Amino acid sequence: MSNLPQTQAHHLQPHPQHPQHLLHHHQQQQQQQQQQQQQQHGHHNHSDFPLPDGWDIAKDFDGKTYYIDHINKKTTWLDPRDRYTKPQSFEDCVGDELPVGWEEAYEPNIGRYYINHIAQSTQLEDPRQEWKSVQEQMLSDYLSAAQDQLENKREMYDVKQQRLLLAQEEYNHLNKLAASRSSLCSSSSSMSRHDPELLRADLMLARERVRQLKQELNHITNDISHTERGMNTLYSVGEKINARENGCYDIAEVQAIREEMLKVHKSLVSGEKVREELMRSLVQIKNELSRQQMNEENADLLNAASPFDRVCVASQTDLCGAGESLNGGARFAEMAKTKLQYAEWRKHIKKLQQQLADHVERIEPGQLESDKDRILLIQEKEKLLNDLNSISLKSRSLEETQVIQQTRQKLEDDLKEAYEANNTCIANRLRFHEEKQHLLDKLQEALKSTKLLEERLKSFSSESTFSISSGSSLGSLSTASSKSALSFTDIYVDHFAVDSPIDVVDLQRRSQRFFQQQQQQQQHRLPPVHGHPVLQQQQSSEVSLSPRSSLSMETPPASPMKYNAGADQPQLPPAAASLAPPKEEPTYANALPAPPAYTAPPPAPIAAVRAPHAYDLDSTVLDCMILEAKLKKLNLNSPLNLAAPLSPISEKPSLLDLPQEMLSRSSSTSNTRSVSAAVSNESVAGDSGVFEASRAHLPRRELAQVQIGLKYLKQEGVLVVSLERANNLLALWTASSDNSQVYLRAALLPNSLTSIRTKALGDFQKPVFNDTFAVPISLDKLLTKSLQVTVVSMTGQKEEIIGTVQISMAEFNPDDSTLKWYNVLSSKFMPSFESLDIPSTSAAAAAAAVAANNTNAMNSNSNNNREESSDESTITSSQTSTLTRNQAPPLELQAQIAEELPEHVRLNEQECSDDDDDDDDDDDEEEEDEQQLIGTEELTNSSGMLDTYLKIMKQQYADKETNTECAFPPEKSRAQSQLLDDRPVKRSQTFTPSAAVSKSRYNCRLNRSDSDSAMHFGVTPHTFHRGAAERRSLRFHTKAPKTATKLHHTHIPRTSLDLELDLQAQHSKLFFLNDQIAKLQNLKDVLQKGCESKDPLIAAWAIENEEFQRLVARADPAKCPEERQLQKLLMKTAKEIHKLRKTKVPKGCPDLVSFKEKITFFTRKGLSVPELPSEFILADGDAIEEEEEEDDNAAETAIAINTALVASSNRNKNLSEHHHRAACNSGAVPKRSATPTPITAATTADASASSAPATAAVAPTTAATVSDDKPDQQRFDYVVDRNYGVEV
């Protein structure tokens, strides 16, 4: 859009001419107004000034306005009135103004860009901001710091090379001793001097040490090469941007770079698939090599207890998930409790993400890598000093002795200076890093617990309507400053390439401990111990700093828990012990499968167990904590583990679960799911030998159980309920006197008019009732009922419900009779169970009939006045909610109380049902309910008791969601009548609660949630969103004004430097990906040949090499699915944390942290693929290279490195000069075109050209033919060079 539309104006009508004196006077007046505007910072519109004489307005084909100068016969995009209404320069701009000649435009794929009509150019950067200069300064500062880091790496290389020379000298000396069988001049101990076995062992150790040091030296060399390559790339990026005019790309070049990035991204995606396939092949080859290593006589043992072929017996007894082992009421209560826990964990995850986003700014990107190199350099010097101290000076000459002593003194001085510098410089940074790791460990544990809760919720029922939002509520993860398809995390976050970092805090503590030991030796003036390195290592402390135990660059060191905690500074607890998940409430069954990786977490401290107090707890979580307190009163101090084993055999899983450590089995380590002991004595699996009988004798409190028999007689249409016996009812209630008795009461809910009860017995331990009842009911109605059996204690005239059992008849098989033991849920764990004084239940049927008749009469009047009401929907949703249905015993209590009310007690439907609601409707609906109340007479003492009880019940309901998974129609007070409801169904016909329910009598009006069948009856003020994360917030949602929802682009836009860094980052990733694929392919071929030939050396290397084991562990299919899903969640959470951190950047301010992460990406070390050694073991007679040869190799390496640096610098300068000359010679600016400029891919470009000195740059070519006849239509095409972006 930088070109000016050239049109002939002879056919256009000129604008009417003004008189000359009027025009002159008008111009003077406008100049005065302009001066006043600059002084007062006023603003004027174009409508305040007319067009000058001879100007006209027209529109282009795309609607863009341009202006015609009839006098000069030219066209321009600039409004001639801008010189009166806009500032003349950037210094005169106020706020977000642009001076005259500048225009802000927008392109969908690129975003905002700016047009300079005067210079006829476009640029990506905002000319009003100085962000580009800040970026250039940050890049220069980082290159200086990276140069220091590179010097540390080179010094580490020199130190390790000296250690390698000493190890080679020791190996050659031992090899000569073994060959000559003479020990007269041996410098080893007296024991090894006369023992050939010890001498042979020392030789093996020395050979292994040489091999390990060579491997470490190779790692350092690769690390140096990687850092140099990254620095060369950053230097080339800076030089290229500086070579541009104003250091900016125009829009055509930006578009070309964007297209090139998308092409590279496609190549990366396809390359990652190839890498994953190679990784899976390596896992298979490694497993095959491991099998070959086993002896043939142990083949049977391998098949029986192989780590690759796991045998799990859990599937023999696994029923259809956790929810199937619970009946209706217990399952609903467990689901509601699990939902609360899930919601709290989600809040905790959001809080941890926010803390991590705040913590990122405290740690300088790339600083941790520099600190790690500095500490590793200190450790290398410590090890070299230890090697020098182990050298015996008896056989050395005087000159050699002086050189060794001088080297020792120099190393001691360097170490002392380094210790002081580290204590003052990196102490705070390491503390911040340790806090960050602590938060990351907490986040990992929280994600793990959340994933387990999701699995539990999904396994409760196949009819469950619970939806788990796996997506983030943070919106799009792409950076707001970029309109490209690739986000910041897509380019600069590669979770596969990042290797497991070395614990820098551990390295620092080890260095400090070594320094303290050195100081203690100096204070006590202890002479250094000289002798054999093996014996010296045995005499040293646990911190092995001898030459036998060199620290690998790629292998993380030992855990700090191995060292004496008293000698260290106070440290944070481990991640798994520092975070205890929010303690689980008393459960009916911890029916959650436990993955092997999470079955044995470290014990959590008491302070961490109470961690939920630190969070923002709501009333629902407070109720859960109250339940925990009640459980503790029963002397059950052991926590209920979140990952308790699954017990699918139990008809009613245990409430008082055993601790996890008591349920663990040593023989079930290879199983994917643990199985607990059978609860019922009649359980088939309990006698089949699947469970261990010893678990029944563990110290625990016995469960209260009831044996119930069920049989349905189809011909008579009668359900036979047999209440046989009970067991250990003292676990529910302790008798207060000797005359206490207990009986069972049963009812079919809902709409139960009468209840059946057994005789009262005084035996609470093993009462035998043997009562059988026949309940006439049709089969269709039976399938919609739920049998509720309550355990009632009676002391004199006082009765108290102490437990309940609820059995869903939808799961009952009418063709078979059952006799099962059911666990009794104690009333102590139900918030609504209170002791009530009930006179008697003898007149239950008569009182219920009177109450039903009164209610039906009122219902008929109410139905005539209003067909639908929000109260009905409130009643329905509350009575079908999970907590309400879970609290079925209180509903039975209400029915019993209503049966005892006098005849003058007349309560309408709305009053009773509104009191039973969870008090979730708005004030308008409550006022409407109060208007429909019918006047009642004064209540007796029993009615007052009912009001008090219902008020207590009103405070207990906390579930605000609507449950539609019931297998029976919702219970209502008016449904106690036997009249059929012939009103039509007012809900969506796609919802069918049960096939046995007749739609002619089913009415369900729901308007309390944002589901497809529960919409508001009026005009909804919000649009419907399926699967909304928080539906209750959308009930009375008001539309936000458009001004509030409009996206404001007040952020810092991308600069040309950002764009070039993104392009080079993509090419660097592609280069290293190709390098990894080549190494993996070579490794696969070698291992495959070794597997076919059964080479023991290759098999030993594949099994023992730690680097190879870490590599294949990433793609091991034997890894449990939960762990793979956890890794995906961690990757997703990293993107969310980045998004959160972006939102914390103030509007209009640059994101310094993100830019620092960009430039540190090029020098960050990724995952290295192990290389097979040329020789797996050294021969005894082979001589190792001497010191002179090593010096020559080091000199050659240094010369090669210097040559590469000089060649790369010269190449960058030459290409920059060539580009500058090409830009000057072109002298033309690409014009705006309706179609994108075609891009010709460079066929000979290679991603490695930026660091390889011999690679020739691809010369820019012009694909389009320039026509001399049509200069106005002249266009330039761009060729993308993989190393230096876009060239004209």
From Swiss-Prot:
Pfam family, one: C2
Domain of life: Eukaryota
Composition-biased stretches (Basic and acidic residues): 1267-1277
Record carries keyword Electron transport: no
Parts forming coiled coils: 143-170, 197-232, 333-461
Domain C2: from-to ranges: 702-822
Keywords, comma-separated and alphabetical: Cell membrane, Coiled coil, Cytoplasm, Membrane, Phosphoprotein, Repeat, Transcription, Transcription regulation
Residues in WW domain copies: 49-82, 96-129
InterPro entries according to UniProt: C2_dom, C2_domain_sf, C2_WWC, WW_dom, WW_dom_sf, WWC/KIBRA_Hippo_Reg
Subcellular location: Cytoplasm; Apical cell membrane
Role noted for this protein: Regulator of the Hippo/SWH (Sav/Wts/Hpo) signaling pathway, a signaling pathway that plays a pivotal role in organ size control and tumor suppression by restricting proliferation and promoting apoptosis. The core of this pathway is composed of a kinase cascade wherein Hippo (Hpo), in complex with its regulatory protein Salvador (Sav), phosphorylates and activates Warts (Wts) in complex with its regulatory protein Mats, which in turn phosphorylates and inactivates the Yorkie (Yki) oncoprotein. Kibra acts synergistically along with Ex and Mer to regulate the Hippo signaling pathway.
Protein family (similarity comment): Belongs to the WWC family. KIBRA subfamily.
Subunit structure: Forms a complex with Mer and Ex. Interacts (via domain WW 1) with Ex (via RXPPXY motif). Interacts with Mer, Sav, Hpo and Wts.
Annotated protein name in UniProt: Protein kibra
Gene coding for it: Kibra
